């Protein structure tokens, strides 16, 4: 992609993930060109990439819509992520060295410093950034470029669902404290190199958002 189309791709992807464009909403080219101040060519290139990533669908070979969301897809993606991450934790514990341990500890500390505040996009962005960095630090010890690429793909597929969960938890003091407790327990198991416990904790940790997302999707 060109630099211009890459910008369009990033902006549109971010808007879809955050729900600024709703599932099944038609993406009118006139609206997109106005919103992003980009030409039709770069936007078509950006849309084609988002079709490949299953965030956008083609309508009658001439238009585009935001991809739909469903409970079945939610369960499938999150189950795949949880099992993939659990496997990567096992490999990371077996292969990671002292520098890996130090990085996990540092990222866990940075994440623990965040506390719930006002319902701002900045808070969500900062939490998500540190949360991703923490999880990435853990699995980085596996040392497999290809497995990490597969993990990143699953992460992207889960992004819209994750953002629903983020809005419902990060801005809640009680829920945020529970998440901090989970992260501390997980970090301790990883650094103790307790493979079985760390893997199961990671799997359960990544499955916990499901009920919250289901409630939100049901309008509760």
Curated annotation (Swiss-Prot):
The keyword Coiled coil does not apply. Residues 1-69 form the HTH gntR-type domain. It is found in: Cytoplasm. Pfam families: FCD (PF07729), GntR (PF00392). InterPro entries: GntR_C, TF_FadR/GntR_C, Tscrpt_reg_HTH_GntR, WH-like_DNA-bd_sf, WH_DNA-bd_sf. This is HTH-type transcriptional repressor GlaR. One of its GO terms (molecular function) is DNA binding. Negatively regulates the expression of the glaH-lhgD-gabDTP operon in a temporal manner during entry into stationary phase or during the first few hours of carbon starvation. Thereby is involved in the regulation of a L-lysine degradation pathway that proceeds via cadaverine, glutarate and L-2-hydroxyglutarate. Binds to two primary and two secondary sites in the promoter region of the glaH operon with the consensus sequences TTGTN5TTTT and ATGTN5TTTT of the primary sites, each separated by six nucleotides. The repressive effect at the glaH promoter site is specifically relieved upon glutarate binding. Keywords: Cytoplasm, DNA-binding, Repressor, Transcription, Transcription regulation. It comes from the Bacteria. GO terms for cellular component: cytoplasm. Its main location: cytoplasm.
């Amino acid at each position: 992609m060109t630099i211009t189309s890459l910008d369009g791709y990033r902006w549109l992807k971010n808007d879809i993930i955050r729900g600024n464009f709703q599932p099944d909403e038609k993406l009118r080219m006139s609206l997109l060109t106005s919103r992003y101040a980009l030409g039709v060519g770069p936007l078509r290139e950006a849309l084609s990439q988002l079709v490949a990533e299953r965030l956008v669908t083609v309508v009658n070979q001439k238009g585009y819509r935001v991809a739909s969301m469903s409970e079945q897809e939610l369960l499938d993606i999150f189950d795949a992520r949880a099992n993939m991450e659990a496997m990567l934790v096992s490999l990371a514990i077996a292969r990671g060295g002292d520098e890996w341990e130090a990085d996990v500890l540092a990222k866990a500390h940075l994440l623990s410093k965040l506390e719930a505040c006002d319902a701002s996009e900045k808070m969500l962005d900062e939490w998500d950034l540190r949360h991703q960095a923490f999880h990435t630090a853990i699995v980085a010890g596996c040392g497999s470029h290809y497995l990490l690429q597969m993990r990143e793909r699953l992460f992207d597929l889960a992004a819209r669902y994750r953002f629903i969960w983020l809005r419902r938890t990060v801005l809640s003091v009680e829920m945020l404290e529970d998440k901090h407790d989970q992260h501390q327990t997980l970090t301790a198991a990883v650094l103790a190199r307790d493979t079985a416990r760390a893997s199961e904790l990671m799997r359960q940790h990544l499955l916990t958002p499901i009920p919250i997302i289901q409630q939100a999707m049901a309008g509760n």
